[in-house]
Amino acid sequence: MADDWESAADSEVVIRPNATNNINKWEGEDDDEDVKESWEDEEEKKDEEKPTKADVPVKTKPNKALKAKLEEQARLEEEEEANRLANLTPEEKLAEKLRLQKIQEESDLKHALDAFGVTSTGGGGLDAFNPESKEEFKEFGASLSWKIAQYKESPHFPQFVEDLVRGLCVNLSATDIKKVKINVETLHSEKLKMEKANAKKPAGKGKGKATLRTENDDIDGYKKYGNDFTDDYDDFM
């Protein structure tokens, strides 16, 4: 009977496998790694999408020593020019005045050519002028004078100017011709004084030199004829 109980006990004993043995303790960690990697990728993309700041140019400080040196140089040049003008004789002052006037005329001519779109080397430049007003005729005359003055070194230039003036005056009335004659005579007188002064040897100030009247600024009337008339123009009429 005891054997029957033992056999019965043995038959009822059922060995169940441990359910926990089949559970993967690393399960789910791969998913965590995938999520982590996706976060890192998103962070990298955000960093790449951030706009980079443009390089700000570095402002260079001006060289104070160089600036001061240039200002001092300009001041010395102005003083030197002022001293030079102060030591000029009346004849030299007149020559300087005419020189500056010529520079101003050339500058005015350049502005006039630019205003009319005319170039000094362009073909048919003077044909582009069609003056109507007084100012336009002045600009046209300045342009003609500039063009003609390019040939002043030619030995035929004096005769050419004489013929040109005579031909132009044919179209004027006697009253207007008289005005032209007065202007030419004034120019002749000034030129004669300058040439005589240049022919003299340098001497002490105020010795043997007549003082010229330089307050006569009425030279606009002969601007269009240039500054190179010969001394015998008082007889051309």
UniProtKB/Swiss-Prot annotation:
One GO-annotated biological process of the protein: regulation of translational initiation
Family under the similarity heading: Belongs to the eIF-3 subunit J family.
Protein name, UniProt field: Eukaryotic translation initiation factor 3 subunit J
Bias-annotated ranges (Acidic residues): 28-46
GO molecular function: translation initiation factor activity
Region described as Disordered: spans on this chain: 1-66
Major subcellular location class: cytoplasm
Subunit architecture: Component of the eukaryotic translation initiation factor 3 (eIF-3) complex. The eIF-3 complex interacts with pix.
Localization: Cytoplasm
UniProt KW Cytoplasm keyword: yes
Function as written in the Swiss-Prot or TrEMBL entry: Component of the eukaryotic translation initiation factor 3 (eIF-3) complex, which is involved in protein synthesis of a specialized repertoire of mRNAs and, together with other initiation factors, stimulates binding of mRNA and methionyl-tRNAi to the 40S ribosome. The eIF-3 complex specifically targets and initiates translation of a subset of mRNAs involved in cell proliferation.
One GO term describing the cellular component: eukaryotic 43S preinitiation complex
Segments of skewed composition (Basic and acidic residues): 47-58
InterPro entries for the chain: eIF3-like_dom_sf, eIF3j
Residues in coiled coil: 63-112
Keywords, ordered alphabetically: Coiled coil, Cytoplasm, Initiation factor, Protein biosynthesis
